[in-house]
Amino acid sequence: METENIHSFDVSLFSSCRVLVVGDMMIDEYLWGEVSRISPEAPVQVVEVKKTTSTLGGAGNVVNNLTALGAKVSVAGVMGGGKAGDLLNGKLTALGVNTEGLLVDQGRATTRKTRVIGANQQMLRIDRESKQEISEEQVQAIVRFAQNQIPQCDLVIASDYGKGVLTRSLMEELAKICKTAGKALIVDPKGMDYSKYKGATCITPNKKEASQASGVEIKDQASLERAAAKLLEIAGAEKILITLGKDGMALFSPGEEPFRVHAQARQVFDVSGAGDTVISVLGLSLAAGASYKTAAALANTAAGIVVAKVGTATVDQAELKAQLQDQPIAYQAKLKPLQELKSALENLRRQGKKIILTNGCFDLLHEGHINLLEQSRKLGDVLVVAVDDDESVRMVKGQGRPIIRERERVKIISAMTGVDFVTVFSTNQLDELIRAVKPDILTKGGNYKPDQVLGHEIVEELGGRIVLIPDASDVSSTRIIQDIRNGRG
């Protein structure tokens, strides 16, 4: 059996799931800049930094994925003190995560990976970290927290990035507590010795990790099965899910036939963090009552969504639901009512994303509209397009407008790959819209002046700014309509 019928699965069940994540919490930092010269000191490029952003990394990215899917999350681990530790704790707290199990060790570095981006390329990565195993005293403190939390949770995820938190003794204790409480322990492994994960319910290595840890070069189905069998024996796990990149993933259980799920991504832009999405959706699906085969198929579907996004990304319930129902994600998941949009943007803002807002009628989409949207998208990380409802278009443009009704206009805008979210608003809701979106930048066409843009005072009050996009041509919807009425094609 290669596929599982997952189309009827209710992803809203994820919202009632409680998860404990134990592992190596990190900060992923990005320095975005421009390169225009070579240093006079050495033959290296000079990056003029324009923007700095940061987000949760490592086990923290698992937390990002879980919260984006609506789960309630607690974390346990060890971090350093200072600014990096405060930043890590602050980002977790902002997501509504219970951080009581996150210990502070002033003598330990909080893992921070700084990527320098210039000319749209990663030029350098700087790592600040400690790989030293945590002390037995710290292990016992985490165990006490876990003993209190696990009976209240539906699932435990151990995310190992090899930074010293998931010691052998801690893994042994977690396995015992989970077994006693009857809760699943899902492990994203690291390193060559999987015997430290003995007692795990399921382990989720990728192809390279599975090959290295098993000592079996995976080059076909037979070698894949040998590697899986060896790792199941070493780890004593009930299941192993091996992710295979473009070849999907494979689920193995002792004494059962392998279950293969083929990759679903239509296009792949970035595989960063896809493994964190897999373990998150796999775990939540199991917690929500799915079988392992269904959970694996759901995880595969979610992975297909995130790899089509640029950068380390997450998937939310709306996107996953739309994909499961074979509906265009562009329309079903991008269109959000204002309050739902506000919540989605708050999560992205906490991840350091720069939010761009543009608004308009978009009645008879033309070259000027396309240019506005394309140029707006280049200014940040997330583009929100607010579309005037039919009554607002009528008020602004007069009787006989809109030519294209609201529902169709929304579908057309949503179909553009550079657009992340679409919302519908009325003219008298503009202030409410801006306060909900809190854009870093509000864009309008070049036929305006900044102080003529409606809502500019609120944008500036909230710390944003207005950017005018020069018109690419003199075409307009009004002119097109007039030409048609005058019989000119």
Swiss-Prot record:
InterPro entries, per the entry: Bifunc_HldE, Cyt_trans-like, PfkB_dom, RfaE_dom_I, Ribokinase-like, Rossmann-like_a/b/a_fold
Catalytic activity: D-glycero-beta-D-manno-heptose 7-phosphate + ATP = D-glycero-beta-D-manno-heptose 1,7-bisphosphate + ADP + H(+); D-glycero-beta-D-manno-heptose 1-phosphate + ATP + H(+) = ADP-D-glycero-beta-D-manno-heptose + diphosphate
A GO biological-process term: ADP-L-glycero-beta-D-manno-heptose biosynthetic process
UniProt KW keywords: ATP-binding, Carbohydrate metabolism, Kinase, Multifunctional enzyme, Nucleotide-binding, Nucleotidyltransferase, Transferase
EC number: 2.7.1.167, 2.7.7.70
Residue positions of the active site: D276
One Pfam family cited in the UniProt record for this chain: PfkB
Enzyme class label: transferase
Cytidylyltransferase: annotated segments: 357-489
UniProt-recorded Gene Ontology molecular function terms: ATP binding; heptose 7-phosphate kinase activity; heptose-1-phosphate adenylyltransferase activity; phosphotransferase activity, alcohol group as acceptor
UniProt-listed Gene3D superfamilies: 3.40.1190.20, HUPs
Residues noted as binding ATP in the record, renumbered to the chain: N206, K207, K208, E209
SUPFAM superfamilies cross-referenced by the UniProt entry: Nucleotidylyl transferase, Ribokinase-like
Region span, Ribokinase: 1-328
Pathway assignment: Nucleotide-sugar biosynthesis; ADP-L-glycero-beta-D-manno-heptose biosynthesis; ADP-L-glycero-beta-D-manno-heptose from D-glycero-beta-D-manno-heptose 7-phosphate: step 1/4; Nucleotide-sugar biosynthesis; ADP-L-glycero-beta-D-manno-heptose biosynthesis; ADP-L-glycero-beta-D-manno-heptose from D-glycero-beta-D-manno-heptose 7-phosphate: step 3/4
Homology family: In the N-terminal section; belongs to the carbohydrate kinase PfkB family.
Function: Catalyzes the ADP transfer from ATP to D-glycero-beta-D-manno-heptose 1-phosphate, yielding ADP-D-glycero-beta-D-manno-heptose.
Protein name, per record: Bifunctional protein HldE
Organism listed in the record: Desulfatibacillum aliphaticivorans
UniProt gene name: hldE
